Amino acid sequence: MWINRLVKHPSYSVLRFYTKRLCTVSVKSLREFGVLPNSTICHSVYPRRTYVMGRAVINDILIKKSYSTHTVCAIDRSKDENNGSAYDKFEAKGIPIDVHTLKRIISSSGMDESEFSKSISYLFAKTVDPEPKDVLSLEDLSFLLSKLYTQRFQIRRICRDINAKYSEFWFKLFSLYAEKVDAKRNQVNLRNTKLDACEIFDANLMIKNFIELGQLGKAQKILSFILDRNPDILLSPKNADISTIVHFLQLRCGALAPYWKIPDNSEQKQGFLRKMVRLGAKNTSIRLSSTYKAMDHQTLLKIADLALQEKKLLNSEDLLSTLIQSFGHLGQTQILERCIEHIWQISPQEFPSHVVIKHRGCYPSSKILVSILVSFYFNDHDLHRGLSILDSFIKHYPDVKLDALFWRRLFQLSHFAWTPANDKKATSVVRCWHLMKQWYASKRLRPSVDYETLRQLYDIMKKTGNFPLGIDVLRSFKPGIERTRAENAGKVNNIIIKYQKCIIKELVNRGRFSAVREFIDSYGFDRKMTKDLNIFCANRMFLRSKKMKNKIENKKEREKVRLDSFDDDEDDGMIIGSLW
């Protein structure tokens, strides 16, 4: 009750009077409610977001924000409402950082450490606590870090505008954070003390950001920062941290599938080596580093041994997905098959459909199935084994949800596996398309629009001349396309125009003018697009008629030349005959 009264009367005198008591009682109360454990070192017993939320609650009450009541009430929410990260919940009522302040802080990243630290303190004072502070505490910087991460896309745009290095700004922020972490331990003589759960959470947040930027070297340095201070964080059943293990597998065991070089059979030319492509090369949501090497294979086997024994690790979708990719990148497909059989009871040997199987880990998801498909294709250069295991998953786990990323990867891999010399009509890719339609129809769902999926199917349609496939694609995605166009998705709009023009061109070339009119009426989507398509159609019809006219005239010309040549030969024959 006294905490609520304090929030209602936020005078500075009352705040200073109760600061010490508030910290002590708040921590004690949070422990009683189960929000904070008795020890912050054994962080694996409770979820990391619990510690982050506890720190955020105390920090928010101390800085006297109006939205602190929402944070306190969040403790009593049900588990279903607390599925997101603690920082995301805390940001729900937060104040976004204005553009002017962001520009100032980004510009300061080129200064020395002291000036950058002062700029960060200014940012905290302007956005969180107006009371000036000479030195920003680690808790304050942790809170500020979460705010900056939620606005990372805006920060990236500002960096482009002022010609600042976005990645350098974040690494400077990490350097300041690491300095405060070590300084905190020096002050209380805890140099050998491990990082607590909130510090590990913050470090992993920055690793995730650098992986998205394709700055794997900087991500490696932050990972080393965690491992040097918490050497048992990967292999200890008690202290294992899932996010750190996932990032270790991604950075040091090859579990970043978008970076893998995949052979593309569809572009292979006779006498030339197969072209190697990367799955994430066309994805604008991430940047790819120019090099990617996996290093630590021994630790991978130890992590796998731990993961297959610990229930909390088996229930992590992210961990199992990255573990599968690591085995795929290492080429250990036999170990991968045994892991799949151990966790989900799925084997390359077909089970009878009436057999009831039980999974030991998390329920199979789209992310896990993508990892399985990519891993087997990476080693086999063929989809046969991956698709056979996929069929078993769909049969024995009917509730598995296949999202847009799954279908994107399936079409990418089927396109790469397609050999035009052996399959001119790309029946393997078309079969995957029908599989996708059947799955969505069985679930009574509409397929979600994905640019890369549309692009892969467009390439197949154009290479094979299979315009009925293009019409079928537009028909299936029509509701999603209309919704996406309303949101001004430029890339999707451009690929749709390519579909339309390619189909109109094929129909006009085949003389199916009534079908062209029906197509434009059905898939014009709006008045402007319909007008543009009619103009394009009229131009194609004019070019076709001109081409046909030239063809007829050329045929007449050739016939005339042939007749003239025949007459000359006949005259020559008559002359020679008379001489004889």
Swiss-Prot record:
InterPro entries: ATPase_expression_mit (IPR024319). Residues 1-40 form a transit peptide. The gene is AEP2. One of its GO terms (molecular function) is RNA binding. It comes from the Eukaryota. One of its GO terms (biological process) is mitochondrial translational initiation. It is found in: Mitochondrion. Present with 2680 molecules/cell in log phase SD medium. This is ATPase expression protein 2, mitochondrial. Binds to the 5'UTR of the OLI1 mRNA. GO terms for cellular component: mitochondrion.
